Amino acid sequence: MEDIKDSKVKRFCSKNILIILGFSSVLAVIALIAVGLTHNKPLPENVKYGIVLDAGSSHTNLYIYKWPAEKENDTGVVQLLEECQVKGPGISKYAQKTDEIAAYLAECMKMSTERIPASKQHQTPVYLGATAGMRLLRMESKQSADEVLAAVSRSLKSYPFDFQGAKIITGQEEGAYGWITINYLLGRFTQEQSWLNFISDSQKQATFGALDLGGSSTQVTFVPLNQTLEAPETSLQFRLYGTDYTVYTHSFLCYGKDQALWQKLAQDIQVSSGGILKDPCFYPGYKKVVNVSELYGTPCTKRFEKKLPFNQFQVQGTGDYEQCHQSILKFFNNSHCPYSQCAFNGVFLPPLQGSFGAFSAFYFVMDFFKKMANDSVSSQEKMTEITKNFCSKPWEEVKASYPTVKEKYLSEYCFSGTYILSLLLQGYNFTGTSWDQIHFMGKIKDSNAGWTLGYMLNLTNMIPAEQPLSPPLPHSTYISLMVLFSLVLVAMVITGLFIFSKPSYFWKEAV
């Protein structure tokens, strides 16, 4: 009788405990679902915007960037929202007509007001950085350069954005900002932090060097193997995300592809006769009339200036790659180097180190040849062969083959391709082997490779000197531990259910 009573009590307790466990499990499932839905509920997008105008020597581009405000100091989160090319030449060409600058900028600035929400416009910074074209204008006339920048500032202040200034950036800044841009977008500045992650300096990701070619200047920037540079003026120091960088950077003013062509013409016309210049850097059959006043209208050709017996001369193409190459090398002065190693014109250049991203005109010209060769530009030798063959084509055939390409660019591709090969090989000391380390970049993660993003990141202090704090546990470790503890909990519940459903296995009578 006592046994029957005891058995009933045990069954009653077991049922009640099972009911409580079942009810608790249902509540737990509901709670997990509620937490999951709450955690994954999309939040209102909190986005910030920034505008940078790249006032180059040949044209002006406007870039609108956006990034999530809560991830402002993360690497690689800034995205290019919109790009607008301002119609017309570079702002330096408006030195004598500054009253036209407002209309010049109007279309792209109006587009900006349409792309950026009105509620965000007052806190959207606007920066204008002018490069080599304005550096050259300032060399000719500081007053004219100041008047252009003042007119630009008046125009940009009239829009509902937070105008932060218009300035002429130095060649060093241009090189450094380009280096920051490509390494930021490639994620080269940060390492994933965790309690299990110990990374030595030798294991950290190597940065890319930066090669920039514009219309009026070219820049080379990279982290050299030897951190002590022979020419201190070519060195810059950065502390980014907790890592110190010593960067070599130099800008060669007058060696952008447009000014380099003017230099070559000014040099070659000195030994021509009769107002005709036979030029191997243009296609056979190509003809163009050049005004002497325009030829000597830039500071880059002043060293070649002399009194000519004519006001105009005609360029007649002969299309010979080897002769073109030799004529280009003449204005790379390699006769004197006061350092252990130089680029050209006696400028110190340490041994090249690592991979390089080549952008701006480097990319645009190489992309043309790559498409022309059906993506078969695999080596320096192949690029040389393609350029050599292209230069020898008759001008009429070239025009017929590429009817959609603007004649100015098309007519200069022979020179541009030859100049890039000469600059990289004889100017910057790349070889057929190290050529493979050059990566020609147009966009990285949908953002333009170039100095503008690095410029904005610097001015908005969006790259901290120290690595942002990360959670004690990485997300993957957190998930793993949660799964482990959940499995342990489930195992305990199953064991408990088994105990109460099969009490005879565990509740033995004492002997």
Swiss-Prot record:
PROSITE patterns, per database record: GDA1_CD39_NTPASE
Keyword terms: ATP-binding, Calcium, Disulfide bond, Glycoprotein, Hydrolase, Magnesium, Membrane, Nucleotide-binding, Transmembrane, Transmembrane helix
Tissue: Expressed in primary neurons and astrocytes, kidney, liver, muscle, thymus, lung and spleen.
Extracellular side: 38-478
Catalytic residues identified in the record: E174
Region span, N-terminal lobe: 46-171
Tagged with keyword Transmembrane helix: yes
GO BP field: ADP catabolic process; cellular response to aluminum ion; cellular response to interferon-alpha; cellular response to lipopolysaccharide; cellular response to tumor necrosis factor; G protein-coupled receptor signaling pathway; negative regulation of ATP biosynthetic process; negative regulation of dopamine secretion
Glycosylation sites: N73, N226, N291, N333, N374, N429, N458
Transmembrane stretches, start-end: 17-37, 479-499
Superkingdom field: Eukaryota
Cystine pairings recorded for this chain: C84-C108, C254-C300, C281-C324, C337-C342, C391-C414
CDD domains, A to Z: ASKHA_NBD_NTPDase1
Membrane topology: Multi-pass membrane protein
InterPro entries (UniProt xref): GDA1_CD39_NTPase
An annotated Gene Ontology molecular function: CTPase activity
Cofactor section: Ca(2+); Mg(2+)
Record-listed E.C. numbers: 3.6.1.5
Spans within the Cytoplasmic topological domain: 1-16, 500-511
Sequence segments annotated as region (C-terminal lobe): 205-441
Entry comment on modification after translation: N-glycosylated. The N-terminus is blocked.
Record family assignment: Belongs to the GDA1/CD39 NTPase family.
Subunit structure, as described in the record: Homodimer; disulfide-linked.
PANTHER family (UniProt xref): ADENOSINE/GUANOSINE DIPHOSPHATASE (PTHR11782), ECTONUCLEOSIDE TRIPHOSPHATE DIPHOSPHOHYDROLASE 1 (PTHR11782:SF32)
Function in brief: Catalyzes the hydrolysis of both di- and triphosphate nucleotides (NDPs and NTPs) and hydrolyze NTPs to nucleotide monophosphates (NMPs) in two distinct successive phosphate-releasing steps, with NDPs as intermediates and participates in the regulation of extracellular levels of nucleotides. By hydrolyzing proinflammatory ATP and platelet-activating ADP to AMP, it blocks platelet aggregation and supports blood flow.
Name of this chain's protein: Ectonucleoside triphosphate diphosphohydrolase 1
